[in-house]
């Protein structure tokens, strides 16, 4: 596959500039159309304030919500052009963050979000944004950590491989980045319960598949531990990786988010950008 359309969350968070810059550099490198999406949160505002506010107060609040979204899109446009994106689109969405980003992500090849930051409580910010989009969009999500600076995400890459459908999808979605990488390390994990064991040497088939796509890999067993998420992050640090690719495990019912242990660990403790697909 190729990235032809990249979506990035535009808001007024202190993490927005780095998120937008990474998305714009990827759009430039892959000659992709870049969409900045800002949510007004008007739908949630109506639900939470459907009684007790007079018409004038409602209109003023809605105007303020629109103003904040437009300000976020102004920042997106400025930063994206500075980073070299050549095809830009501003998208103002009358919805909350979770629903607005999940629906828009379905029509993009890659969505760029930031890791949740408990220390920054913006009005309308959703703590479950990343897992919600990952579990409801049927598209890959690139998550940028809340700490650190990341100039590149396609130099050295660690790929978590356990033979699962989620890991297979993540690799397929990451191919444009893997082809550009200097180093790709395949971290072998034990297959999830209920999955068939590989007939050949673990990792041989997926390594062959990747080599046919022009991606030579170095196969390594992950450290034997109960904390696989921490082991993956440790391996990424060891090889100086700037991207981790992995399947996102979890279940989404209504607005309840149920995540697998490895996914939850990585989303909470990530130290480098992570591409996840469910």
Give, region by region, the residue ranges found by the protein language model:
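Structural beta-alpha unit
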Residues: 1, 78-111, 212-244, 250-254, ...
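Small/aliphatic-rich secondary-structure junction motif
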Residues: 1-56, 136, 149, 153-221
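Amphipathic coiled-coil/heptad-repeat helices and related helical stalk/stem segments
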Residues: 19, 97, 126, 167-170, ...
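Gly/Ser-rich helix-loop-strand patches that form or flank binding pockets
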Residues: 20, 25-29, 100-149, 235-278
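A structural preference for short, hydrophobic beta-strand core positions in alpha/beta folds
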Residues: 36, 89-92, 143, 186, ...
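Generic structural signal for helix capping and beta-alpha/helix-loop junctions
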Residues: 44, 97-98, 120, 151, ...
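A short acidic, glycine-rich active-site loop
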Residues: 56-71
């Amino acid at each position: 596959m190729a990235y032809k359309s990249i979506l990035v969350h535009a808001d007024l968070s202190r993490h927005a500039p780095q998120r937008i810059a990474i998305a714009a550099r990827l759009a430039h490198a892959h000659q992709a159309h870049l969409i900045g999406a800002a949510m007004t949160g008007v739908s949630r505002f109506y639900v939470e304030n459907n009684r007790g506010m007079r018409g004038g107060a409602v209109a003023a609040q809605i105007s303020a919500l629109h103003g904040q979204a437009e300000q976020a899109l102004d920042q997106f446009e400025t930063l994206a052009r500075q980073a070299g994106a050549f095809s830009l689109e501003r998208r103002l969405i009358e919805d909350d963050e979770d629903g607005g980003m999940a629906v828009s992500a379905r029509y993009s090849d890659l969505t760029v979000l930031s890791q949740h930051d408990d220390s920054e409580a913006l009005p309308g910010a959703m703590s479950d944004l990343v897992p919600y989009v990952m579990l409801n969009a049927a598209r890959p999500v690139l998550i940028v950590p809340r700490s650190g600076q990341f100039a590149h995400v396609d130099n050295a890459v660690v790929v978590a491989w356990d033979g699962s459908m989620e890991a297979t999808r993540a690799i397929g979605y990451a191919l444009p980045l893997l082809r550009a990488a200097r180093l790709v390390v395949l971290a072998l994990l034990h297959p999830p319960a209920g999955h068939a064991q590989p007939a050949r040497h673990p990792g041989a088939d997926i390594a062959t598949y990747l080599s046919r796509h022009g991606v030579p890999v170095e196969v390594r067993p992950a450290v034997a531990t109960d904390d696989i998420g921490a082991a993956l992050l440790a391996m990424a640090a060891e090889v100086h990786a700037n991207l981790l690719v992995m399947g996102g495990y979890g279940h989404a019912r209504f607005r309840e988010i149920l995540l697998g242990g490895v996914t939850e660990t990585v989303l909470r403790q990530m130290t480098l950008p992570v591409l996840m697909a469910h």
